[in-house]
């Protein structure tokens, strides 16, 4: 181990930089730590620059997002990660099979034996602070899009992430009164702590109207889209003059429409990330799924 210390340290450093490039800035936002050893160890076989580095890191990106949105590491994570490491290493090093053909992505279990989570599975993903892989995976997509603060517009960075709070887009108090579970990943946005307190228990429509008074609708939309928050489904409200049964029925329908639409947007982003593609929040939100 002592002889390989420099190589190990370099691998860890490159892994950390790679994760930052994917919007993973700290351990609290990492969906599964099973990927850490795999990526760090693979960097021993990846050059520092050039086309080969780009090719290999594209493979790592695909691997990372499959790890976040499949069930591969829900159980026996360490043993599964070791198998995936060996298969990925064969691709990166150009190892050949007995028939002379190269190993490919179809030979890696995380790709060949797993399917990406579907929209319905994303809808039920738990609150990201609870440290479930899928719940944190949903939040990781927003972090990858730099999760702009609703009020200031500040982008998420390694320097300000510790000042971000887990915000209920539909207020917890409002949903709780109607007997609706608010602690879903699709109802979460990572925003500045002061913004979180300022919003309080305002319904989404009221908060949007408050923002429109001092900034443009376009700017507000851009900030919300960086979290893949669908604007149309958020422009609800009008619960004040309804009876409790009417309010609860309307709120349940509005909330269901919101989380379903947001799950569709997240699913579209996940598919792009799992292909190693770049993300553009406005394009994802603008196009129909």
Task: State each model region's role.
Residues 1-48:
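Polyanionic (Asp/Glu-rich) segments that form extended negatively charged tracts
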Residues 220-289:
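C-terminal, well-folded lobe of enzymatic/effector domains
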Residues 179-181, 199-229:
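Polybasic, low-complexity binding patches
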Residues 188-197:
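Substrate-recognition/cap regions that form aromatic- and gly/pro-loop-enriched pockets
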Residues 157-187, 200-205:
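Histidine-centered nuclease catalytic patch
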Residues 53-68:
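Short secondary-structure subsegments characteristic of cysteine-rich extracellular domains
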Residues 68-166, 174:
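Intrinsically disordered, low-complexity N-proximal targeting/linker segments that flank membranes
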Residues 1, 64-88, 92, 221-238:
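Charged/polar, low-hydrophobicity segments characteristic of intrinsically disordered regions
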């Amino acid at each position: 181990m002592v002889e390989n210390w420099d190589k190990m340290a370099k691998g860890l450093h490159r892994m950390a930089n790679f994760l930052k490039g994917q919007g993973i800035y700290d351990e609290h936002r990492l969906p599964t730590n099973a990927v850490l050893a795999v990526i760090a160890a693979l960097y021993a076989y990846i050059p520092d620059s050039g086309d080969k580095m780009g090719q290999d890191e594209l493979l790592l990106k695909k691997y990372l997002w499959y790890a976040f949105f499949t069930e591969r590491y829900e159980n026996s994570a360490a043993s599964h990660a070791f198998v995936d490491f060996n298969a990925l290493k064969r691709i990166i090093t150009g190892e050949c099979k007995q028939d002379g053909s190269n190993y490919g992505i179809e030979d890696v279990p995380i790709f060949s034996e797993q399917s990406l989570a579907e929209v319905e599975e994303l809808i039920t993903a738990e609150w990201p602070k609870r440290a479930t892989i899928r719940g944190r995976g949903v939040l990781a997509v927003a972090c990858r899009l730099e999760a702009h603060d609703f009020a200031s517009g500040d982008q998420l960075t390694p320097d300000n992430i510790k000042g971000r709070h887990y915000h209920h887009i539909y207020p917890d108090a409002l949903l709780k009164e109607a007997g609706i579970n608010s602690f879903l990943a699709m109802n979460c946005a990572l925003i500045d702590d002061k913004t979180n307190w300022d919003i309080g228990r305002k319904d989404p429509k009221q908060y949007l109207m408050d923002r429109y008074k001092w900034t443009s609708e376009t700017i507000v939309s851009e900030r919300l889209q960086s979290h893949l928050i669908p604007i149309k489904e958020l422009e609800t409200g009008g619960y004040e003059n309804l009876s409790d049964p009417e309010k609860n029925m309307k709120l349940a329908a509005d909330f269901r429409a919101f989380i379903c639409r947001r799950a569709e947007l997240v699913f579209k982003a996940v598919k792009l990330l799992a292909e190693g593609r770049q993300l553009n929040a406005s394009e994802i939100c603008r196009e129909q799924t």
